[in-house]
From Swiss-Prot, chain A:
Location of the protein in the cell: Mitochondrion
Native organism taxonomy: Eukaryota, Metazoa, Chordata, Craniata, Vertebrata
Broad class of the protein's primary localization: mitochondrion
E.C. no: 6.3.5.7
Name of this protein: Glutamyl-tRNA(Gln) amidotransferase subunit A, mitochondrial
């Protein structure tokens, strides 16, 4: 049952094949069994069981709230959850109990979803590995998959060689990939949803900026943050998006226009569409496997009757440095509120003056990555530097936005790009570079989308020669999220990405292959 | 992209009639003259020509002072600028704080429509250019009563720019000449108020009250066109009246709804401007004038003694009447301004630009607000002068007290007495009684109708003016009697019987031959003495003019 998609399990609930409480308990038990993944910071067992009980009552009375009623979900630990600890994986917010729910959380709960827990991340979502949180790194479930174990070298199978999930929403990606929930919320500022989705073999969707409320999401970069969605298939993402999207009076950057329903056609059609391949995304660092899959994917579209053309996004090479300036500047500003006075950590060390209290609190509360970004951001915002850094970066951001505007204006419907440079790497490999370098490398294909506010989705495509997931990214026009997901659904159907085979879960019958997806996909190496 | 989203927060009341204006509170004594009391009072403290009074010594130039003001006015609104928390003065600490005001992570600002309307109206009333598009910025500094670590303000593109404020100043020995002056307005911006820190030095702790945090402020920045404390105080007073008339702010300085910072420098005319100091948090007009004049004099003295002026922030010690450097540990602040990313640009419309399909709740039309502007104080004064033939200074006096104009107009409506008489009674007798007991107009025991009835009796010559004063005093006791009742109870009616009066006059003439002799000798004071004697004999119930007429006839003058 747990291996099914959200839509499948939803219909099982409706037909009474399983009750919400049974489903909830199965997930809770799997969460316990996969504790070693460190995907969850908080497991909200009591809350989830209570919610399941209420959901069950509704089903019994024939008053189900809809597709999400009774569906176990997980939420990244940077979304505020009323009465449930929300830490951002930081000492600064350990023990912080928000008094309110983020709008997206509330909307899930209003539809009857069961909140299984809060998932792990890089501290304040600053990172691309889910390795830099105060609760330790998240382990990629594929490390323990039959596919990886069979194909990777012997030495890679030692316990110390576990793989990272990517980040910063690695906990949510791992939670969905390991079947502990049917959908999870992440956040995406520079790729934080799409990157771990690619490494964990899930769908990872970043909606258009302004489509989904950020109220209650503890911000990284307000002008780029969006709540992201992890699911095991594109249809499931559309279901969740349908619940989350729409104007929120508490977030003035959400659009007022009424949101159309996000049901995708059962037989999506991409013939007649124009698929753009940005030539700047073909970089030397791109792994040959991904490069080859990218090219095969383009062929698939062409074979279906889509027009595939090379397009030019000329300012792409300036994007990452521009992102760095804008990101750290907003970080410096957003982190100013963590001063130990109103909530969160307060240093017990030095109480001689308010300034000393601030300094000690912030020294103890933040990790080096956060502190580093605060320092650079404040540097860029200094009066003497503002024009040269912040304003210039904003101008470059405009150029990058215009690149996309021009491409989409020229008739391109969707862009097809890689999501990451490589497959997931072992933790020991990953930490050889610092967070800043890693973020710059890992966000290379993803952050420009955030600067432009466009919708984008990672679709898992195939397993690498080592048996690890590889994803490709589709980027759509602003607010054409439904069109993007339709294309993604068609693409997903073509590639037939294999289901992860987690040995210990297979053994106890939690995961019985049910839809024949365990066969290799059409895009294999 | 996203449209600006506005909340509705309607004002508690449009007119601040019930509030007692602080400067009238500060006034004391019952010397109520016909001109603006404010100006008169100021003249005793402000020494307007202080700096020019410096007699230039040999080889020296005169000094000129340059004063600019930044005025923060709390917007009169039910809720805060970016949150739904209520706005209310003197509520229990931290009882009016939303999650946003406490800067809980993940909360976002939502702009209050009412605050925007107040800002546009203030901009229009102050002859500003209203920017159809304005932006919000973050201004960063760490302070315990600023929970987010930044204030949202309008640094780059404020809602209104380039206006002017006309105010009046009194010249001449008796301040009887009124001249108008103009100060340019650089800009008006919307911004958040901070919370309040209360330092408990004994226990060395700081208590924080966030009730004020996030209340909408209008920051009005005046160009440095002022030259002394009196000018500054008069300009601020006029601004205060305008904001109150608009209902944009209650602008009560004693309650901190209007706070003024002054930038002050001195230089020799024709030479470059001097280094300026900033005097912060002046919370009464009297202290504003005092602080500015003290600071001007301090700078002149400093420079003449070969010292230099530091670009620093000073505070005014009202007990000692001087300005002192403020302790500023951080030294020069770099506020690291940054665009507020959570608020789209604030877009305003006019009649021609309102999009046809726009949600009316999301549209603010400048033209519509212009149509809604109430009569402004300057126009009211002009109207009073035109309509009632009033002296300009009387029109100032009527507007200078909260509620006094309304009181005056209500008396006018109900009485047959001449407007001039009403003006005199309201500004002299009535206001004098209020001041004496330190009461606001709204607290007066005498209603406009009661005064109107009294003035009718006076107008119809039923009572003398001295009897009228007596009746007014009775009315003030507030025992519920009407003027007519008091007159009849105390037998204060004038003797209408001319024969009886003639008899009284005859008797007085006969009883005071010496005075009569003086009258015949053309001693000008004698006739008045005789009139006085008759009045006394009539127990003040005779009309002096009539007595004089009869006496003159009898003595065949």
């Amino acid at each position: 049952m747990l291996g099914r998609t959200l839509r499948e399990v939803s219909s099982a609930l409706k037909q009474g094949h399983i009750t919400p409480t049974e489903l909830c308990k199965k997930c809770l038990s799997l969460i316990k069994k996969t504790k070693y993944l460190n995907a969850y910071i908080t497991v909200s067992e009591e809350v989830a069981l209570k919610q399941a009980e209420e959901s069950e009552k509704r089903y019994k009375q024939g008053q189900s709230l809809g597709d999400l009623d009774g569906i176990p979900v997980a939420v990244k630990d940077n979304f505020s959850t009323s009465g449930i600890e929300t830490t951002c994986a930081s000492n600064m917010l350990k023990g912080y109990l928000p008094p309110y729910n983020a709008t997206v959380v509330q909307r899930l709960l209003d539809q009857g979803a069961l909140l299984m827990g809060k998932t792990n991340l890089d501290e304040f979502a600053m990172g691309s590995g889910s390795t830099d949180g105060v609760f330790g790194p998240v382990k990629n479930p594929w490390t323990y998959s039959k596919q990886y174990r069979e194909r990777s070298r012997q030495d890679a199978q030692e316990d110390s060689h576990w793989l990272i999930t990517g980040g910063s929403s690695g906990g949510s990606a791992a939670a969905v990939a390991a079947f502990t929930c049917f959908a999870a919320l992440g956040s995406d500022t520079g790729g934080s949803t799409r990157n771990p989705a690619a490494h964990c073999g899930t769908v990872g969707f970043k909606p258009s900026y302004g489509l989904v409320s950020r109220h209650g999401l503890i911000p990284l970069v307000n002008s780029m943050d969006v709540p992201g969605i992890f699911t095991r298939c594109v249809d499931d993402t559309a279901i969740v998006l349908g619940v989350l999207a729409g104007h929120d009076p508490k977030d003035s950057t959400t659009v007022n226009d009424p949101v159309k329903p996000t049901t995708l056609p059962s037989v999506p059609d991409v013939s007649g569409l124009c698929i753009g391949i940005p030539k700047e995304y073909l970089v030397p660092e791109l792994s040959s496997e991904i490069r080859s899959l990218w090219s095969q994917a383009a062929d698939l579209f062409e074979a279906e009757g889509a027009r595939v053309i090379e397009v030019c996004l000329p300012h792409t090479c300036y994007s990452i440095v521009c992102y760095h300036v804008l990101c750290t500047s907003e970080v410096a500003s957003n982190m100013a509120r963590f001063d130990g006075l109103q909530y969160g950590h307060r240093s017990a060390v030095d109480m001689s003056s308010t300034e000393a209290l601030y300094a000690a609190t912030r020294q103890e509360g933040f990790n080096d990555v956060v502190k580093g970004r605060i320092l650079s951001g404040n540097f860029f915002l200094l009066k003497e530097n503002y024009e040269n850094y912040f304003v210039k970066a904003q101008k470059v951001r405009r150029l990058i936005v215009n690149d996309f505007v021009n491409v989409f204006g020229s008739g391109v419907d969707v862009l097809l790009t890689p999501t990451t440079l490589t497959q997931a790497v072992p933790y020991l490999e990953f930490i050889k570079e610092d967070n800043r370098t890693r973020s710059a490398q890992d966000d290379i294909f993803t952050q420009a989308v955030n600067m432009a506010g466009l919708p984008a989705v990672n679709v898992p495509v195939a397993l690498s020669s080592q048996g690890l997931p590889i994803g490709l990214q589709l980027i759509g026009r602003a607010f054409c999220d439904q069109q993007l997901l339709t294309v993604a659904k068609w693409f997903e159907k073509q590639v037939q990405f294999p289901v992860i085979q987690l040995q210990d879960l297979m053994d106890d019958g939690s995961l019985v292959p049910e839809n024949g997806k365990l066969t290799s996909g059409s895009l294999t190496q | 992209m996203a449209a600006p989203v506005l909340r509705s927060g309607f004002p508690g009341r449009r007119w601040a009639l019930a509030w007692i204006d602080d400067c009238s509170r500060l006034r004391s004594g019952s010397q109520i003259g016909p001109i603006s009391n404010w100006a008169r009072r100021q003249s005793s403290v402000a020494q307007p020509s202080l700096h020019t009074a410096q007699k230039p010594r040999k080889g020296e130039h005169k000094w000129a002072a340059v004063v600019g003001l930044e005025i923060h006015a709390q917007i009169s609104s039910n809720s805060k600028l970016f949150s739904g928390a209520q706005v209310c003065f003197a509520a229990p600490p931290n009882s009016l704080v939303s999650y946003f005001d406490a800067s809980l992570p993940g909360t976002l600002p939502v702009l209050n429509r009412r605050c925007v309307e107040a800002a546009v109206m203030a901009g229009l009333a102050l002859n500003c250019h209203i920017n159809k598009k304005s932006l919000f910025d973050r201004k960063h500094y760490f302070y315990s009563d600023l929970p987010a670590g930044y204030q949202i303000t309008q640094q780059r593109l404020p809602i209104a720019t380039n206006g002017h404020l006309t105010y009046s100043i009194y010249l001449g020995k008796k301040h009887s000449q009124v001249t108008t002056k103009t100060v340019r307005i650089k800009q008006i911006q919307l911004e958040q108020d901070s919370g309040k820190s209360l330092h408990d030095d004994l226990r060395s702790q700081t208590l924080i009250d966030l009730n004020r945090a996030g209340i909408g402020l209008l920051e009005v920045v005046l160009e440095p066109d002022l030259c002394c404390g009196e000018e500054a105080a008069l300009a601020v007073r006029e601004l205060q009246l305008i904001l109150q008339a608009l209902g944009a702010s209650q602008a009560n300085m004693a309650e901190g709804q209007l706070r003024v910072d002054a930038n002050i420098s001195v230089h020799h005319p024709g030479e470059a401007l001097g280094v300026r100091t900033e005097v912060k948090n002046l919370n009464s007009l009297r202290f504003l004038a005092k602080a500015i004049d003290y600071e001007i004099q301090r700078q002149i003295t400093e420079l003449e003694n070969g010292g230099e002026i530091l670009n620093e922030t000073r505070s005014f010690d009202y007990k000692r009447g001087c300005t002192m450097p403020m302790r500023d540990k951080e030294g020069k602040q770099d506020y690291r301004f940054m665009p507020e990313p959570n608020l789209p640009p604030l877009v305003l419309y006019d009649d021609t630009s309102v999009p046809p399909d726009a949600d009316p709740q999301q549209v603010i039309s400048i033209d519509r607000l212009r149509d809604m502007l109430p009569e402004l104080p300057s126009a009211t004064r002009e109207r009073l002068v035109q309509q009632y033939g009033m002296l300009p200074e009387h029109s100032f006096a009527l507007l200078n007290e909260v509620g006094l104009l309304e009181f005056f107009q209500n008396v006018i409506k109900e009485t047959r007495a001449e407007p001039k008489k009403v003006t005199n009674w309201v500004l002299n007798t009535f206001l004098c009684y209020l001041k004496h007991q330190n009461l606001a107009v709204s607290e007066s025991p005498v209603t406009p109708s009661a005064l109107a009835e009294l003035l009718d009796l006076l107008d119809s010559k039923a009572i003398s003016s001295s009897a009228a004063k007596q009746v007014f005093e009775e009315l003030w006791r507030g025992e519920g009697k009407t003027a007519a009742q008091i007159v009849s109870e105390q037998q204060l009616e004038l003797i209408q019987d001319e024969e009886a009066l003639e008899e009284l006059c005859q008797a007085t003439i006969e009883g005071h031959p010496q005075v009569v002799m003086d009258v015949k000798k053309r001693n000008p004071k004698a006739i008045n003495k005789l009139v006085g004697l008759v009045r006394k004999a009539s127990l003040s119930r005779a009309d002096p003019a009539l007595i004089k007429e009869i006496l003159e006839k009898k003595l065949s003058l």
